[in-house]
Curated annotation (Swiss-Prot):
Motif (Endocytosis signal): 756-759
Gene Ontology biological process: calcium-dependent cell-cell adhesion via plasma membrane cell adhesion molecules; cell-cell adhesion; heterophilic cell-cell adhesion via plasma membrane cell adhesion molecules; inflammatory response; leukocyte cell-cell adhesion; leukocyte migration; leukocyte tethering or rolling; positive regulation of cell adhesion
Residue segments, region Interaction with SNX17: 759-768
Glycosylated sites: N45, N54, N107, N212, N347, N456, N603, N654, N661, N679
Keywords from the named record: Calcium, Cell adhesion, Cell membrane, Disulfide bond, EGF-like domain, Glycoprotein, Lectin, Lipoprotein, Membrane, Metal-binding, Palmitate, Repeat, Signal, Sushi, Transmembrane, Transmembrane helix
Source domain of life: Eukaryota
Tissue distribution of the protein: Not detected in the absence of exposure to lipopolysaccharide (LPS). Detected only after exposure to lipopolysaccharide (LPS) in the tissues examined: spleen, lung, brain, liver, heart, kidney, thymus and small intestine.
Taxonomy of the source species: Eukaryota, Metazoa, Chordata, Craniata, Vertebrata
Domain Sushi: 198-259, 260-321, 322-383, 384-445, 446-507, 508-569, 578-639, 640-701
EGF-like domain span: 159-195
Protein's UniProt name: P-selectin
Entry function: Ca(2+)-dependent receptor for myeloid cells that binds to carbohydrates on neutrophils and monocytes. Mediates the interaction of activated endothelial cells or platelets with leukocytes. The ligand recognized is sialyl-Lewis X. Mediates rapid rolling of leukocyte rolling over vascular surfaces during the initial steps in inflammation through interaction with SELPLG. Mediates cell-cell interactions and cell adhesion via the interaction with integrin alpha-IIb/beta3 (ITGA2B:ITGB3) and integrin alpha-V/beta-3 (ITGAV:ITGB3).
Length: 768
């Protein structure tokens, strides 16, 4: 055990006898039979079964401390004396780790002094002998060690330690002896139980020094650490930190703070200097003011300060003879000065002029005045400006401007947008006269041949660039009863041609019809033979009767308004013996019937449909049979259903259901109890697609509930002075809590939304 160094083993032989009486009692506590031998403050244990080395160590750690750790010859002799002999011998707590024999309990390498190998051991047969056994009561090598493969099964030799974790105040190492222990204190601690900490003592803090200390073990004691710093404008001279060592001595002496020093200054030539030094000469916070003699001016700052970085706030100024700023010839121009020494001193004068294509901006002559300023700013030569021109419509302009936008030597290139043609010069230049070499060109749109609306149709055009010009788009539609023959849309392309030929509107045709047998046909055609608008009149020969419509018309759907009639002899007119019951249009639906002989007679066929929001239940067509019965039951139209709304305990719901509960057209309104607010939409409607227009809302509590008001009321009622206030609040709460009873009752599905109440979700469905 790492925290329990062992003491002398010589006096422990006797104590084994005292501990032997405990073996029988302990064996009943362990599921696997275990025998123990005690020696003073350690107990040795061994298993009665054989295990591999890993399982043996697991056995020891589960029941005791670990496999035994042997560190001297006396311990080996004692174990060989008290532990019984078994032919498989015992595993001990040594194993080869990283090719070194190691005590597994402490993870320390086996020292040469502690080795107790048998002769010619360890030999590492087959390169897998990484664990160690002890020969207990061996005739040839009693108590000696041997390396063995770890998978072999041997008895586990264990020990139990009795050290206490808090011994020696956790500031030293406990050395156990028989029935007692001593403490070996760690550096910096002393005393029988290592209870005292070595002190270094306090020290004086020099002036201006800032100190911050930490004392983990006591003021100015072992492990105390102090850090030092200086205020702004001071440098630390000495160590920045000190530590109290285990010997009770500080690692260094305290440092000192010295004012930051700047470089010494002198008055400039032809000038004076006046300085103030609050701390030391030319040190932090010193300041110096400079002035120049008459006829000279100062170049630089007239006041300098010594900063905390040890640098002056500005460079040392100089005094120079009054002169004007040096001048240079203007770009694209020239300059002549007098005198020509180049000093630009007082009363110097300079004249300026510009090269061709440039004009002088400013005075052509300036003088250096007595204050060192020129009488006017130096002029500049600017390129002549050509007049700005408007960018032609549908044109792109790209200019190169070496001397500025639209100035001398500027060149502008023109190009036209797609669908436009350039008329004029493609490039114009700004000349030295300030005029353009050419007039700006124009872009004229490409035009296509104008189109006309087709006969019996219409044409709608979008012409962003002008009538029938490029990018014009024309859409064509035909009047009712006509269809488009050709493209529905034409575009004017950049080449000036339409993308196709103009379409035509042709009349919709109906199937050709003929005169009935024993009859005649007379037709008139407005838009062509048997086309939309054509009408035909039928008649029968004498002695024959017309059955069907006498007049039919070709409709826009391409069908005749009625089937062609027939002619039957008068004496042989059929008298139908049976008829089917007359049908009626279903509610919210449509019905269209075709009667073969007479209304609802044999072979009459009726077709059914429903309005928006309703679906057909049943067959969509019925035919009257020869027996006078329809082929199916008359269908009905049922409203589309939405999902059922489930009411929250707090939400009140009021619904109107014109076509059934939660069906198409149902509208539900929501409101919350007094004191709560609605979170969401206050109304939702069932749509034709079977979905609600809005999600169902919820109720959330307001800022003050009745219970909270009662809580606040309790404090007022608790005192005599609060009785009046409490009585008023109780009256208000009673009024608020009084259940409203205006003779209102739960609503049924047909209740109007304005009716007060709560929808009871009664079972209402008008369908059979």
């Amino acid at each position: 055990m790492a925290g329990c160094p062992k003491g002398s083993w010589k006096p422990r032989l006797r104590s084994v006898v005292l501990g032997a009486a405990q073996l029988i009692w302990l064996s009943a506590l362990i599921s696997e039979l275990v025998n123990r031998k005690k020696v003073a403050t350690w107990t040795y244990n061994y298993s009665t079964k054989a295990y591999s080395w890993n399982n043996s160590r697991a056995f020891c750690k589960r029941h005791f401390t670990d496999l035994v750790a042997i560190q001297n010859k006396n311990e080996i002799a004692h174990l060989n004396d008290v532990i019984p002999y078994v032919n498989s011998y015992y595993w001990i707590g040594i194993r080869k780790i990283n090719n070194k024999w190691t005590w597994v309990g402490t993870n320390k390498t086996l020292t040469a002094e502690a080795e107790n190998w048998a002769d010619n051991e360890p030999n590492n047969k087959r390169n897998n002998q990484d664990c160690v056994e002890i020969y207990i009561k061996s005739n040839s090598a009693p108590g000696k060690w041997n390396d063995e493969p770890c998978f072999k099964r041997k008895r586990a030799l264990c020990y139990t330690a009795s050290c206490q974790d808090m011994s020696c105040n956790s500031q030293g190492e406990r050395i156990e002896t028989i029935g007692s222990y001593t403490c070996s204190c760690y550096p910096g601690f002393y005393g029988p139980e290592c209870e005292y900490v070595q002190e270094c003592g306090k020290f004086d803090i020099p002036q201006h020094v800032l100190m911050n200390c930490s004392h983990p073990l006591g003021d100015f004691s072992f492990s105390s650490q102090c850090t030092f710093s200086c205020p702004e404008g001071y440098d630390l001279n000495g160590p920045s930190e000190m530590q109290c060592l285990a010997s009770g001595i500080w690692t260094n002496n305290p440092p000192q703070c010295k004012a930051v020093q700047c470089q010494s200054l002198e008055a400039p030539l032809h000038g004076t200097m006046d300085c103030t030094h609050p701390l030391a000469a030319f040190a932090y916070d010193s300041s110096c003011k400079f002035e120049c003699q008459p006829g000279y001016r100062m170049r630089g700052s007239d006041i300098l300060h010594c900063t905390d970085s040890g640098q002056w706030s500005e460079p040392l100024p100089t005094c120079e003879a009054i002169a004007c700023e040096p001048l240079e010839s203007p770009l694209h121009g020239s300059m002549d000065c007098f005198p020509s020494t180049g000093a630009f001193g007082y009363n110097s004068s300079c004249t300026f002029r510009c090269t061709e294509g440039f004009v002088l901006m400013g005075n052509d002559a300036i003088h250096c005045a007595d204050l060192g300023q020129w009488t006017a700013p130096a002029p500049v030569c600017e390129a002549l400006q050509c007049q700005e021109f408007p960018v032609p419509s549908k044109a792109q302009v790209s200019c190169s401007d070496p001397f500025g936008p639209l100035k001398y030597q500027s060149a502008c290139s023109f190009s036209c947008d797609e669908g436009s043609l350039l008329v004029g010069a493609s490039v114009i230049r700004c000349l030295a006269t300030g005029h353009w070499s050419e007039a700006p060109p124009e872009c004229q749109a490409v035009s296509c041949t104008p189109l006309l609306s087709p006969e019996n149709g219409t044409m709608t055009c979008i012409q962003p660039l002008g009538h029938s010009n490029y990018k014009s788009t024309c859409q064509f539609m035909c009047d009712e009863g006509f269809y488009l023959s050709g493209p529905e849309r034409l575009d004017c392309s950049p080449s000036g041609h339409w993308t196709g030929s103009p379409p035509m509107c042709e009349a919709i045709k109906c199937p050709e019809i003929f005169a009935p047998e024993q009859g005649s046909l007379d037709c008139s055609h407005v838009h062509g033979e048997f086309s939309v608008g054509s009408t035909c009149h039928f008649s029968c020969n004498e002695e024959f009767e017309l059955l069907g419509s006498r007049n039919v018309e070709c409709t826009v759907s391409g069908r005749w308004s009625a089937p062609p009639p027939t002619c039957k002899g008068v004496t042989s007119l059929p008298v139908p013996s049976v008829r089917c019951p007359a049908l009626t249009t279903p509610g919210q639906g449509t019905m269209s019937c075709r009667h073969h002989l007479e209304s609802f007679g044999p072979n009459t066929t009726c077709y059914f449909g429903c309005k928006t929001g309703f679906t057909l239940r049943g067959a969509n067509s019925l035919r009257c049979g020869a027996s006078g019965q329809w082929t199916a039951v008359t269908p009905v139209c049922r409203a589309v259903k939405c999902s059922e709304l489930h009411m929250d305990t707090a939400v009140a719901m009021n619904c109107s259901n014109p076509w059934g509960n939660f069906s198409y057209g149902s509208t539900c309104a929501f409101h919350c109890p007094e004191g709560q607010s609605l979170n969401g939409s206050a109304r939702t409607t069932c749509g034709e697609d079977g979905h609600w227009s809005d999600a169902m809302p919820t109720c959330q509590a307001g800022t003050l509930t009745i219970q909270e008001a009662l809580t606040y009321l309790g404090g007022a009622l608790a005192s005599t002075s609060g009785l009046a206030v409490g009585g008023t609040l109780l009256a208000l709460l009673r009024k608020r809590l009084r259940k409203k009873d205006d003779g209102k009752c739960p609503l049924n599905p047909h209740s109007h939304l304005g009716t007060y109440g709560v929808f009871t979700n009664a079972a209402y469905d008008p369908t059979p």
